[in-house]
């Protein structure tokens, strides 16, 4: 836990009774009766979205704390994903996009180019910052940005807003349905002048099942519930399984795509 955590409370979700945890050396301890609990914390610039279920036995549960502080970074024209020897390198595209936002480019002269190393990046990416470019500098190899959400299903990792949430993915407490047909990459209306070059955008939903999707607890649900169970052996490319699932959603003006592939099945 962060050093800034000064109080932890576990609230019984049935009767709202509050239990206070004893905090010591970045750990916590308390006694709870059977039930489901929401965790609330006093943690400075951090917050947690966590739940614990107690059923007749001791429970050990690490809590995920995420910073609420708005990061500011000095602007640089180039950042990298998957290039470990490079300065300003990030391990995921999502982290790189977050860094772009922290640099806050205000016009074309402050454009940030995200150089993405060839490989598979299984993550939902939301771009809400203007003047950002995604580029694959090795076009003979593929940069694949892919994700698995689709209409008619619920997933643990979807937050209340309908998009991937790191906190919800870790908590695995309740499921939600996707917005924008589960777009693998969503260029929001604030992301003016987005560019991509030599990138493949893919929705795997109607193509193949991933271990990550199964681990995310995919189940039929939502207002457009689909009467088809998605399992390791399911033929998700069949007509029976096909549903709306977008590889790319674009609302930002002046978006440009060069030598890109956009791959899905229904409503790409």
Language-model segments: residues:
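Feature marks extracellular polysaccharide-active and adherence modules
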Residues: 82, 99, 117, 128, ...
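A short, solvent-exposed beta-strand micro-motif common in secreted/extracellular proteins
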Residues: 34-44
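Short, ordered, surface-exposed loop/turn motifs in non-cytosolic proteins
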Residues: 1-21
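Structured interaction patches on ligand/partner-binding surfaces of diverse proteins
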Residues: 44-68
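Acidic Gly/Asp/Thr-rich repetitive segments characteristic of extracellular carbohydrate-active
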Residues: 78-115
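Extracellular beta-strand-rich solenoid/capping regions of secreted or surface-exposed proteins
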Residues: 98-106, 122-134, 144-195, 206-227, ...
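Short, surface-exposed beta-strand/beta-hairpin micro-motifs centered on an aromatic residue
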Residues: 24-32
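Detector for repetitive beta-architecture
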Residues: 78, 111-113, 118, 124, ...
